[in-house]
Swiss-Prot record:
GO molecular function: metal ion binding; tRNA-guanosine(34) queuine transglycosylase activity
Binding partners and assembly: Homodimer. Within each dimer, one monomer is responsible for RNA recognition and catalysis, while the other monomer binds to the replacement base PreQ1.
PANTHER family on file: QUEUINE TRNA-RIBOSYLTRANSFERASE
Cysteines joined through disulfide linkages: none
Protein residues bound to substrate: 95-99, 149, 192, 219
UniProt organism field: Pediococcus pentosaceus (strain ATCC 25745 / CCUG 21536 / LMG 10740 / 183-1w)
Family assignment from sequence similarity: Belongs to the queuine tRNA-ribosyltransferase family.
Function: Catalyzes the base-exchange of a guanine (G) residue with the queuine precursor 7-aminomethyl-7-deazaguanine (PreQ1) at position 34 (anticodon wobble position) in tRNAs with GU(N) anticodons (tRNA-Asp, -Asn, -His and -Tyr). Catalysis occurs through a double-displacement mechanism. The nucleophile active site attacks the C1' of nucleotide 34 to detach the guanine base from the RNA, forming a covalent enzyme-RNA intermediate. The proton acceptor active site deprotonates the incoming PreQ1, allowing a nucleophilic attack on the C1' of the ribose to form the product.
Catalytic residue positions: 95, 269
Record InterPro entries: ArchSynthase1/Queuine_TRR (IPR050076), TGT (IPR004803), TGT-like_sf (IPR036511), tRNA_ribo_trans-like (IPR002616)
Name this protein carries in UniProt: Queuine tRNA-ribosyltransferase
Amino acid sequence: MEPAIKYRLIKTDKHTGARLGEIITPHGTFPTPIFMPVGTQATVKAMSPEELEDLGADIILSNTYHLWVRPGEDIVKEGGGLHQFMNWKKGILTDSGGFQVFSLAKLRDITEEGVHFKNELNGANMFLSPEKAIQIENDLGPDIMMSFDECPPYFESYDYVKHSVERTSRWAERGLKAHRNPETQGLFGIIQGAGFEDLRRQSAKDLVSMDFPGYSIGGLSVGESKEEMNRVLDFTTQLIPENKPRYLMGVGSPDALIDGVLRGVDMFDCVLPTRIARNGTCMTSHGRLVVKNAKYARDFTPIDDNCQCYTCRNYTRAYIRHLIKTDETFGLRLTSIHNVYFLVHLMKDVRQAIMDDNLLEFRQNFFEEYGYNKENSKNF
């Protein structure tokens, strides 16, 4: 039986661990490294599928937990699965809901069977197990789905993380057995282990032995420093087979994307570009710009003079500032379009730099222009 997801390595950068490749899915082939915009509720906030396609997005992420709670996976399935339900014809990846259960849910109780918790919307008692998570994802119908895992806090004790990793491996095996559609949906295993190298190695060894079509690196970008995250990536990406995609979950600041690629990561997702857009914060080729600041009231230039997105081709900082200040939804639509375009096209430039074997030089120039080399620089 052919797997639903296949990875093809095209080239490795001569000076780093960066990989140029492509992932073949039932809804098209997309190049890697890639950034995936997040559509938590089956929509990337403030953006239409047509706008996403126009700016070059090839795959988006949706959230299993939120769609299970509302409207329910049965309704999405009845609507033809996520692709048809939201009218998106390209790739979709769903997480397993585990991260939300462990970060949002109140009064949770973790057992070997799964997690009992209260729904944060109405207080109802709910239960999510590896089998239930896979059933929901099968019904939602994404191209790529995640195993149910526990995401322990980065600074949790060694003993706690050890038990958590062992349980996550057992849950991964149960999820693999429960998976009904391996020929149309690729299931990834999630490597955990917080900052402990031996536990990350154990987690990777367990999951690689199960031969998933791809592997995610979880439990990062949860409050640890950039140096800590890069330290963990330095050894973790090497544990994943070369012929499988490597996905770093929940990472989306420009510096972290480039530094992740340098260490061999292929896929990234984050709510960052749309979340910061809603308060008027924009990523530009010259660094972070808060368009609602008073100094832009009479600035009739685009957000970024080097950007070809719909927003920068058509609207000025002064106009967008006016929209944000008056709480007009069109303003946050314009900033969202710009930020998502910025990250999608940053990855396009990164892919070209790998092709040209000059990713380190690209990083140096980008960091200088963006302002990462200044003291007290923001990370987005």
